[in-house]
Amino acid sequence: MIIEIENLIKKFSIGGGLFTALNDISLIIKKGEFSGLVGPSGSGKTTLLNIIGGLDSPTSGNVKVLDKMINETSHDERALIRKKYMGFIFQSYNLLPVYSVYENVELPLILNKIEKNKRRDKVLNAIESVG
């Protein structure tokens, strides 16, 4: 499994009470699968992504990323996992209008110092996979 979430709950303290942002979320994302998270504003999408990425902690439940309990990893390990294995596209994403689609997809690979000959295949495969 790439991502495995079991019985995830996230509550926030608000005005002397508790607000439940995520209630008993369980899901599995396997290698090779693509997933999208869609919902109205305030439904918990960003909260869930922040927990998966190790940027926030759950109130209860388990979150495994690459067979590691994300809340048991160090700050540096979580940063490496996010850098190498995760991509987040939030509601207000934008492509850079001065670049082609190819160049927009290639840009993160350039920033991560991926060799040019490897970038081409990765970019073309990514573009082909989404049509």
Residue ranges and their predicted role:
Residues 19, 70-87:
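ABC ATPase NBD coupling module
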Residues 38-40:
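The feature captures the beta-strand-to-loop junction immediately N-terminal to the Walker
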Residues 53:
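Helix-to-loop junction immediately C-terminal to a conserved catalytic motif
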Residues 61-72:
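Conserved ABC transporter NBD signature motif
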Residues 68-69, 110-113, 117-131:
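Conserved ABC ATPase "signature" region
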Residues 99-108:
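Short coil-to-helix segment of the ABC ATPase nucleotide-binding domain corresponding to the Q-loop/switch region
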